Structures are given as structure tokens and as C-alpha cells.
């Protein structure tokens, strides 16, 4: 079998490539990246004969249509703006796929994918991704699911790569429409830095203040898990949160152009370019990823609570920034192998909780050092 890894030499997805080389059984793994030198260097560094590098331009839709049919699975690690064209191309040519993020319009291709007897799974990272498996695990233990509370701490700097800066700024942008929580049968919009509460994450992250974040679990789980309430809250390191808050308070998310020394540009564009260039926005004392889920429901009519959380090796063992990136990249590798190994029976465009068995997903995570722990109690 052949796997195609889009953006496979990027900041996040290079860890997917490494994981595929170590754990997967593919006959060939092609690292497709716009930066061919980075892809070549990664392939040489890993030193696995199954790996090869190939130039790939995500702006060239025609090249996707020509390239994808030669593979058994397309693994998309590109920035989220390419989610929709990659999904569309996979479905047009009938090749299974998955990606690390989610774009709302992807779900519109569900029926077409079913007609091709194929599956595409958006959002197979940490959150969404591991969190979906956690929620499914808890839901499987309950007769009724009343409330799913997802909390994450993405401990990385705001701008280690352009795509990650886009994600950071989008999650706190005042015009982001998908910052929702679900309650009483309705999706309710929340502004940036609303819904504040304290969550105690495993060390080295510890207790952090989280707020509502726009994530797809809120959209999918009322339907897939029958949850009456769903929310996603998250945070970045304190110094990153200060940047997001400062930009909001001072109107720096504005897209209205201003004139600075004869140059017309919006405050947002100025800040984006500035944050990409300042060295401090690529630094953080702790690289880590914390996930904590509290799921409330009923068993035999009695109220219960299931708390699940993840733990992983510290940055000293996992190589600095890899302690963050692996939490996103490893699930993408696992998800791909489960599709091609025949462990995913779902068809269409489906979220992770509808595609993957949580127990099996956790087994594979544990092999790599990411351990999901659980406490179930009657209330």
C-alpha cells in the first residue's frame, strides 16, 4: 500500500512522517511538500527506504487530481485553508483520506463520499482528534450523555510557523463565527475570551485559565453522541494569551486599512507579519499538550461523571518542540493506518468519533507514549 503525506515536512506533519516510518506497514510513503529541500532532508534524516520526497503545490488543484489516484490514503497535514480542496479532490478520485484540521464545508461532501464507498475523516489531531475518541469512550459507558466539556492547553508559542500563527489568531478573532457552544438544542455564539474557568492539567502545564474556542467537536457531538451540551475551552501559554488579549483590547484584529509612513495596511496584517518575524513569538519555556474532558450523563437513571485526560513524555525526552507537535501528528498517523488496515467501517465524511474505536486508538497512542487515563464515578 502507498501513503501520501501532504505537507509531510512541515512543522507538525514531519512528526507524522516520522511516526509512519516507525510504526506503519505501508510499502511506500511519499512526503509531498512545497519545500522540496525540507522533504528531501527529512527523508534522508529518517533513513527509511520506504520514504521518498516529492514537490507538491497545494494551490494547483489539477496536480491533486493527477497525484491522488496512485495512493491508498491521502494524509493532509497542510494549513486548514487547504482542507476543502484536498477533501474535494480525494472524493472526486475516490481515495480515502484524513486531515489534521476541519473546515465546515467538508461535511457537505458526505453523500458523495458514501457514493464512492470511501471515507474521509477531518480533524484527526489532538483536539479535534484524541478528544473525539475520549468523548466516544465516555459516551459508550453511559445510557444518556448530558454534557461534554472539552478542555485543552496547547503549550507552544504563537508563531512557530505561519499556519500555526493563523490558527492562534483565528481562535481569538472577534469575527470568528464558529466559536460556539451547544446547549438546549441551540448553537450559541461566544465572543473571544468568554466562558473563563480554571482547569488543572497534568504537569508540567498545571492549572490554567481556559476560554471558549472554535472547534468542530461542538458541531458534531450533539448528533454523533447525542450530547445535550457540548463545549470546547482552551488556552495557550500565558505569554501567548496576553498577545491575543492585547490585540483584542487594542483593536488590532481590525481589517480596516491605516496609513503608516505611506504604506496602506490593516492592523491585523501588520500584526501578522510582525509576529512572524519577532524571535520571541517562536519561543516558549514549556512545549506540551494537555487534554482534559469531563463528561456528565446517566447510567440506569443515575448521574455519573467520566473524566479523561492525556499524559505524554516531557520535552526533555521528546526533543523540545516535538513534545507539542507529536500530540497532533501521531493521531494523524494512527488514523491513516486504521483506515487502510480495514479498522474503519464508516463511509462518507465523518468525524473521528464516528470513525475510530476509542480503545484501539488509545492502544496505538500508548505505544508511542501518549497515555489516556480515566476516572469514572457516580454522583
Predicted regions, residues:
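N-terminal Rossmann NAD(P)H-binding glycine-rich loop of SDR-like oxidoreductase domains
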Residues: 4-19
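Helix N-cap at the beta1-alpha1 junction of Rossmann-like dinucleotide-binding domains, i.e.
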Residues: 10, 34-37
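N-terminal Rossmann-like NAD(P) cofactor-binding module of classical short-chain dehydrogenase/reductase
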Residues: 68-77, 97-99
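Rossmann-fold NAD(P)-binding glycine/threonine-rich loop
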Residues: 100-120
Amino acid at each position: 500500500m502507498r501513503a501520501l503525506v501532504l505537507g509531510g515536512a512541515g512543522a507538525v506533519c514531519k512528526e507524522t512522517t516520522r511516526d509512519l516510518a516507525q510504526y506503519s506497514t505501508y510499502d511506500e510513503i511519499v512526503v509531498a511538500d512545497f519545500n522540496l529541500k525540507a522533504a528531501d532532508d527529512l527523508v534522508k534524516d529518517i533513513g527509511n527506504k520506504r520514504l521518498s520526497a516529492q514537490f507538491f503545490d497545494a494551490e494547483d488543484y489539477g496536480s491533486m487530481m493527477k497525484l491522488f489516484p496512485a495512493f491508498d490514503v491521502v494524509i493532509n497535514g497542510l494549513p486548514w485553508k487547504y482542507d476543502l480542496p484536498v477533501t474535494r479532490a480525494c472524493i472526486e478520485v475516490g481515495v480515502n483520506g484524513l486531515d489534521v484540521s476541519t473546515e465546515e464545508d467538508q461535511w457537505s461532501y458526505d453523500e458523495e463520499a458514501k457514493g464512492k464507498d470511501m471515507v474521509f475523516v477531518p480533524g484527526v489531531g489532538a483536539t479535534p482528534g484524541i478528544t473525539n475518541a475520549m468523548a466516544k469512550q465516555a459516551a459508550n459507558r453511559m445510557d444518556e450523555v448530558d454534557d461534554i466539556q472539552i478542555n485543552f492547553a496547547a503549550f507552544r508559542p504563537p508563531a512557530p510557523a505561519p499556519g500555526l500563527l493563523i490558527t492562534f489568531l483565528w481562535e481569538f478573532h472577534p469575527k470568528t463565527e464558529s466559536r460556539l457552544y451547544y446547549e438546549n438544542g441551540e448553537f450559541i455564539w461566544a465572543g473571544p475570551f468568554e466562558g473563563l474557568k480554571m482547569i488543572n492539567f497534568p504537569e508540567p502545564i498545571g492549572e490554567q485559565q481556559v476560554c471558549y474556542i472554535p472547534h468542530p467537536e461542538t458541531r458534531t457531538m450533539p448528533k454523533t453522541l447525542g450530547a445535550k451540551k457540548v463545549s470546547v475551552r482552551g488556552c495557550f501559554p500565558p505569554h501567548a494569551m496576553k498577545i491575543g488579549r492585547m490585540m483584542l483590547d487594542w483593536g488590532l484584529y481590525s481589517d480596516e486599512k491605516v496609513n503608516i509612513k505611506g504604506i496602506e495596511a490593516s492592523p491585523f496584517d501588520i500584526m501578522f507579519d510582525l509576529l512572524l518575524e519577532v524571535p520571541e513569538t517562536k519561543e516558549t519555556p514549556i512545549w506540551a499538550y494537555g487534554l482534559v474532558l469531563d463528561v456528565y450523563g446517566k447510567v440506569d437513571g443515575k448521574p455519573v461523571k467520566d473524566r479523561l485526560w492525556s499524559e505524554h513524555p516531557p520535552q526533555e525526552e521528546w526533543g523540545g518542540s516535538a513534545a507539542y507537535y507529536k500530540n497532533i501528528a501521531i493521531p494523524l498517523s494512527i488514523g491513516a493506518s486504521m483506515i487502510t488496515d480495514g479498522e474503519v467501517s464508516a463511509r462518507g465524511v465523518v468525524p473521528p468519533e464516528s470513525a475510530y474505536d476509542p480503545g484501539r486508538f488509545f492502544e496505538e497512542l500508548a505505544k508511542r507514549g501518549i497515555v489516556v487515563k480515566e476516572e469514572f464515578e457516580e454522583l
